[in-house]
Amino acid sequence: MKSIKWIIFFSIIINVETVMGNNDTKISYHISMPEPHTHYYELEMTVSNNRDRTVQLKMPVWTPGSYLVREFARHIPRVRAFAGTQQLKVDKIDKNTLEVRAGYYKEFTVMYRIYAYEQSVRTSYLSDSRGYLNGTSIFLYVADRKYEPGEVKVTPFRGWRKISTGLPKVKGKRNTFSFPDYDVLADSPFLIGNHDLLTFKVKGIPHEIALYGQGNVDKDQLKDDFKKIVQSTAEIFEDLPYDRYVFFILMLDGLGGGLEHLNSTTIQADRWIFSDDNRYQRFLSTVAHEYFHTWNVKRIRPIALGPFDYDKENYTDDLWISEGITSYYDNLLLLRSGIVDVEDYFKLVGRDITSVETAPGRLIQSAVESSFDTWIKNYRRNEESHNVMISYYSKGAVTGLMLDLAINASTNGRKSLDQVFQELNRRYENDPSTGFTSKEFRTVCENVAGRKLDDVWRYADTTDEVDYNSALEKVGCILERKYGEGVTSSTSYYGFATRGEKNPVVSRVYAGTPAYTGGLNVNDEIVAVNGTRVSTKTLIERLKDISIGDKAELLISREGLMQRVEMTASGPPYDSFVIKKTESPSKDQKQLFEGWLGTPWEK
């Protein structure tokens, strides 16, 4: 291949061998970042063994695992193509598709720059501190050649010495990595810079923690806890389905989130969480969540989620399974790992239950509907979303709890959701090309339970209230409902929240509450309560002074005009939920408890 010097544009090389039927590299990419302060990666994309006079190149519009059309092509300001020194015509035919007029050339090179300056797990980022690449937001692909193998060569910015990725290295080629097809390339992030590397092995398989940033992290403790999570998950599935695994951990200011990949995961965390037990537990829950996705999503998956269509939304009713039941397992794995005890585990589960029970949207939208609508609702929330939506994460986690308890009770503690995922994993291994349908998932669950589970499916399919205690009673537990801190049954309640350091401005109004029926709006500034001037600091106390059943007259500023809103104080709803053991469990309850959590009752 002839080299083409082009100072402005970064290089991705796609190199396709002309020899048919061999195992040589078909597609390769070279990527560099000579000016990271500009936040532009430079790519050179070389296509060999070309047979078409017109070649379509595409840029994905979304990232698998993050269900929103993000239009990554908008970050590419210009694309050029060359065959040797001959410039080829490039036409844009729709928002994410280019046509290269290749003529009779067997090989041509595409050059482009792409802007990357969003710190999230689902996009790419480049600055003078590091480079993070998420494949779908970086790499163009040849429309009809997604399933050809290739290589990626990375040229780091000067002084950057480390490249972490889940892709295997190519022997004899510096900073070069191979992939079997575009799907794997798109699902294999890169972290480039001078980050720390922590390593451990489970079942003889190497695991790497690529740790970026400074914070109050105890690296030895981090590595030990990650290893425990991997070990406890491996006990479910027995074998690890990869030759190597990478945890990308980005310690940043005030940021969070995680995204699963085929043999890696990216997790952002606030750099100062690691000395706070509660925040660190939540971080480890995220780690367990993303790692469990190695099976549940990346392999065991709804039929719509792979192979992917990168051009448009990929709809499924089953994200409550893929994300929600994974959310159930993330806390359970911390218990099995010995990272938390039963009491702390119950608090973590209580947090999921609280998320559901305090959301008015649970009465409007089912978990199945939430799954399907994620493309237009979950990532596009507004001030009304909590009133009309339920998260398939939290409602799915709660449904997973009820499903696990139902299987446990139906089999006298002998079986659980573990056996469901073991069977689904066996099916995947027999046919990796196809995901499950909703019916197939439910059939596997019912076969494991030995009965129909319509009493559980209604929690996914409808907005029926969850009867927690009917299931928890069988394992000697009860769901305890509480008021929040400083709240009693006689505390007046209105159903709105505010923001603002000095003057309270309404940020949320809950459906069916005094504030909602009284006509209070988001963005109303509250000036006075019953004739008394209030500030953010004094508002709550003035409202508490009003007895349940009495009226509160609020003087508000709405769009710069003063007006009055009247509402009647009501009693408070429960807003804290936690599972507790009963004091005198029966022998059968103890047996089912131990079958559920795998830990002795008395421990």
Per-range role (PLM):
Residues 5-17:
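Bacterial N-terminal signal peptides
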Residues 22-62, 132:
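Early extracytoplasmic/domain-onset interaction patches
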Residues 26-28, 40-44, 54-56, 107-109, ...:
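Intrinsic-disorder/low-complexity, polar/charged segments enriched in Ser/Thr/Lys/Arg/Asp/Glu/Gln
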Residues 47-84:
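N-terminal, post-signal-peptide region of Sec/Tat-exported proteins
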Residues 69-78, 82-242, 255:
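Non-catalytic architectural context of zinc metalloproteases
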Residues 196-319, 325, 329:
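Juxtacatalytic substrate-recognition/specificity segment
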Residues 265-274, 299-300, 311-362, 555, ...:
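Post-HExxH zinc-binding segment in Zn-dependent metallohydrolases
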Residues 330, 340-603:
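C-terminal recognition in membrane/secretory proteostasis and scaffolding
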